[in-house]
Regions:
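A generic, lipid-embedded transmembrane alpha helix
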Residues: 44-61, 136, 217-226, 285, ...
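Transmembrane-helix bundle segments that line or gate the permeation/cavity pathway
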Residues: 49-78, 85-106, 110, 139-149, ...
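Membrane-interface interhelical loops and short amphipathic "cap" helices
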Residues: 1-8, 32-35, 58-92, 146-174, ...
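Accessory, solvent-exposed terminal regions and/or long lumenal/extracellular loops of proteins
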Residues: 425-430, 486-625
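Membrane-interfacial loop-to-helix junctions in multi-pass inner-membrane proteins
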Residues: 28-49, 108-133, 195-216, 241, ...
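Extended, hydrophobic alpha-helical segments in both membrane/secreted and soluble proteins
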Residues: 175, 182-192, 203-260, 274, ...
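Contiguous transmembrane helix-bundle modules in multi-pass membrane proteins
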Residues: 1-32, 47-52, 65-67, 243-253, ...
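A conserved hydrophobic secondary-structure block that centers on an alpha-helix together
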Residues: 10-20, 94-226
Length: 627
């Protein structure tokens, strides 16, 4: 099956090249009556990638170690569920999964009402662009990122899946990111196709639902990745500003900026070229995120080593950027970049969009800083988390402030409801005063928390005072997303600067004090009944003011396939207030343990807010009538 699968991908690439060439020649001749051919071609390409993906999954399930990929990411002790998810654990499999998502979305596009509203000219340009994207994926899968390489002789055992990836967060985090990346392919191709065909306005409405879905997947992937970092790595935090973490954040920032400029574009019939550039930039940055992971230029916990995809990705990104600039430079009669007044709701949305882009630019600069600094330094260094916290967090707080006051500006000029705006500002000032009185006086955290509470007040007040919003489902979606963001802002404001942590070496029966909590070491238990690993758990009792709070059992695990390393499994006592978080750093034969215990205030507000934002965003979906 190795050769058959590889040949199928190779033939798919040749078919995509043929379809692109045919579409290009038809476009040059102004012949746009062969759209059905391209649609059938896309269906065929999708069926092929579904088939080869099934082959790889089957090989992973039965542990067919004649595949290099299966040998590298599974072993006979790996549970079936994790064997299936190993499909996207490595760079070759994840690239196949990404292409599978792109192909499936292309297939779905054919049957959407929005697609039926496109004229044939726009459809032909759409398929030219879409097939070009697929050609890149197929080139990668038949060249530097081939998941069907054969291994001879066949080993009796595989190398196993990294234990850090054997976690629910990492099972779903990568596919959600790839679904988000793939989702932006449709708006990108639709925007450029509409621009090239001269049908420059309708695409914004037609790609609305695609944009929402892509944003939801990307947001969910990032939130889940942060939760995985918090629950699996054992360092007590959720965002380390690691280059690969940042790389996935950059397209999200650009995509969020596009969400807001698209609103202005649809309602004010302006910013058409700006929106084309925004969606193309988001699409491009999805590949930049992959470039950071696979190029080997950036050092990161998450990066793949030894990848040959760096140069192909760089060439592809240059081609996309060049095409985007060319398309954006084409003048259209309906082009308008005019904002009537920045002291208006469209003006606030536009300002928020540019702040998102500025944040993306800062994070991009930080990611590339080791590469840039190598131009003038023999010892290039990256920027630490302190840089991002000092520069980015204040801008996020300003964005929260803008989101809280934006609903009270009118569509054309000035403040539409001064009374409501006064209540919102008063709510922010009042919450800041209460927070300060409670002893939380750190300036940035105080400003951020007050901005978050202002958002909550603003959203509740908006629905109280605006009857139309209460009866319009997309309003519930949009403001529900903002409510989730408000909860996240408040969670970040408290969980970062007000975290309390301590480390201690304890013997049986001894205790350590962490903030207002007393943590007592009860016993160390050893478990050897799992054939895949040995587990060593420290059982702890937690009290506060003499009253029992709960128990903890952080673990150290030694996996048979990774005996050179031990892996921590944290334990938490969940709370909407202060969460107690424990990591077992080590132990000795005498039974003493080394522990790290943290008290993380309001950290669960981040996960609740992120989940809320992802779920209610589906309410923003709007029905599009077929033509």
């Amino acid at each position: 099956m190795h050769a058959i699968s590889f040949t199928a991908l190779l033939l798919s690439m040749l078919a995509a090249v043929g379809l692109t060439a045919t579409a290009g020649m038809k476009a040059l001749k102004d012949d746009f009556d062969t759209v059905a051919l391209f649609e059938k071609g896309q269906i065929l390409l999708t069926v092929v990638v579904l088939a080869v993906s099934a082959v790889l999954v089957q090989a992973l399930v039965v542990r067919d170690f004649s595949y290099v990929y299966v040998r590298d990411y599974t072993d006979t002790l790996l549970p079936l569920f994790y064997a299936v998810t190993a499909f996207w654990a490595g760079q070759n499999g994840s690239f196949l999964f990404w292409y599978l998502c792109v192909a499936l979305m292309g297939w779905c596009m054919i049957y959407t009402p929005g697609y039926s509203r496109l004229d044939n000219r726009t459809k032909v340009f759409f398929w030219i662009l879409f097939f070009l994207v697929e050609i890149f994926f197929l080139f990668a899968l038949t060249g530097p990122s081939n998941p069907f390489m054969k291994l001879d002789p066949v080993p009796a055992e595989g190398r196993g899946l990294n234990p850090l990836l054997q976690n629910p967060g990492m099972i779903f985090h990568p596919p959600l990111l790839f679904l988000g990346y793939a989702g932006y392919t449709i708006p990108f191709c639709l925007a450029l196709a509409s621009r090239l065909s001269g049908n420059g306005r309708e695409w914004l409405e037609l790609c609305r639902n695609w944009n929402i879905v892509a944003w939801i997947f990307l947001t969910a992937g990032i939130i889940l990745g942060a939760w995985w970092s918090y629950m699996e790595l054992g360092w007590g935090g959720y965002w380390a500003w690691d280059p690969v973490e940042n790389a996935s954040l950059i397209p999200w920032l650009a995509g969020t900026a596009f969400v807001h400029t698209a609103i202005v574009g649809r309602t004010r019939k302006s910013l058409l070229r700006t929106n084309v550039f925004m969606v193309a930039l988001t699409f491009l940055l999805c590949f930049f995120a992959t470039f950071v992971v696979r190029s080997g230029m950036i050092d990161s916990l998450h990066a793949f080593s030894g990848s040959r995809m760096g140069i192909p990705l760089l060439v592809f990104m240059i081609a996309v950027l060049s095409l985007t600039l060319f398309v954006c430079l084409i003048q259209r009669k309906d082009d308008s970049t005019h904002i009537d007044d920045f002291a208006s709701r469209p003006g606030m949305l536009f300002l928020a969009s540019w702040l998102f882009l500025c944040l993306g630019g800062i994070v991009l600069l930080g990611v590339m800083w080791p590469v840039l600094s190598s131009m003038w330094s023999a010892n290039p260094v990256g920027l630490d988390a302190g840089f991002y916290n000092r520069v980015c967090l204040p801008l996020f707080a300003v964005l929260a402030l803008i989101m809280s006051i934006c609903p009270w500006f009118s569509q054309k000029h000035g403040i539409g409801d001064k009374t409501a705006l006064g209540v919102v500002l008063g709510g922010g000032a009042g919450s800041a005063g209460i927070i300060f009185a409670l002893g939380y006086t750190q300036p940035l955290a105080l400003f951020s928390a007050a901005s978050g509470f202002m958002m909550v007040v603003s959203i509740v007040l908006y629905f109280v005072r605006t009857k139309g919003a209460r009866s319009f489902l997309p309003s519930w979606g949009a403001y529900g997303v903002h409510m989730g963001v408000a909860l996240m802002v408040i969670g970040v404001a408290f969980s970062g600067p007000y975290k309390v942590e301590a480390e201690a070496v304890l013997n049986k029966g001894q205790s350590m004090t962490v903030g207002a909590y007393e943590v007592q070491f009860i016993e160390l238990r050893h478990h050897h009944d799992n054939p895949a690993m040995d587990m060593h758990a420290a059982h702890l009792a937690v009290t506060r003011d003499g009253k029992a709070v709960g128990s903890l059992a952080p673990e150290k695990r030694l996996y048979r396939s990774f005996e050179q390393s031990t892996f921590a499994e944290v334990s938490v006592i969940p709370s909407l207030g202060e969460e107690v978080y424990a990591t077992l750093l080590g132990f000795n034969e005498e039974g003493s343990v080394s522990l790290k215990v943290s008290i993380n205030p309001l950290v669960n507000w981040i996960w609740i807010g992120g989940t809320l934002s992802c779920l209610v965003a589906f309410l923003c979906w709007r029905k599009i009538e077929r033509r």
